[in-house]
Amino acid sequence: MRIATFNINGIKARLPRLIEWLVETQPDVACLQEIKTQDEGFPIKAFEDVGYGAIWHGQKGFNGVAILAKDVTPTEVARGLEGEPEDEHSRYLEADVKGVRVASIYLPNGNPLPGPKFNYKLRWMERLRKRAAQIWAEEIPAVLAGDYNVIPFDRDVWSPPAMASDALMQPESRAAYRAMLGDGWTDALAARHPQGGVWTYWDYQAGAWQRDAGFRIDHLLLS
């Protein structure tokens, strides 16, 4: 099974390119983040027209996650994480697809720090770890895919000093991510490229793409 994760940063604005990418690459499952639309605004027909079923967890103007599956509609298992009933951010969606448990994750950024946004990020990561443990206990094939907003190691960023003060690579958030690896989850990209130097994000400002000034914050954790 080919599983992809893609922070689309606004599904309506990038729908033509997203459809083009689906047709070109034909992933069996695609986890989307930052769809930035309410549930009723999700363009389901556009995906059905190219052979994909979908479920989604939307939010007006912010956040939002979705799971697309080729030739089937994912069977929803969970929407949101337990632990903070007052948390209304649409950041987590979980489904079964052809015998595999799939989660689409948009973890909080955490900037600026210190402060409530970073504290929220750490609490959210602990809630995710608890849910991951529940999935692990089911002893089923599973992948937790998405934008984790965490640079796990220095080899995952073009210049560690340039990002040293960012919430993406603070010791606390890195430790929370590594704790999940310690629980048994496998970082798929790191397993394939242990030397690092593989980026999933480049800032659109200051010519980051042209300079290859990127970092790795999008991860697929496998059971």
PLM segments and residue spans:
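Conserved beta strand-loop-helix elements of the APE1-like EEP
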Residues: 61-76, 196, 208-223
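Active-site environment of divalent metal-dependent phosphoester hydrolases
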Residues: 11-13, 37-40, 113, 151-152, ...
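Metal-dependent phosphoesterases centered on the DNase I-like endonuclease/exonuclease/phosphatase
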Residues: 50-51, 124-217
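Active-site beta-strand/loop signature of hydrolases that rely on acidic residues for catalysis
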Residues: 3-7, 22-40, 102, 131-154, ...
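Surface-exposed cleft-lining segments at the edges of enzyme active sites
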Residues: 82-83, 108-125, 162-166
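Active-site-proximal beta-strand elements of phosphoester/diester hydrolases
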Residues: 1-10, 99-114, 145
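N-terminal, active-site-proximal structural segment of metallo-dependent hydrolase catalytic domains
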Residues: 1-49, 56, 63-65, 180
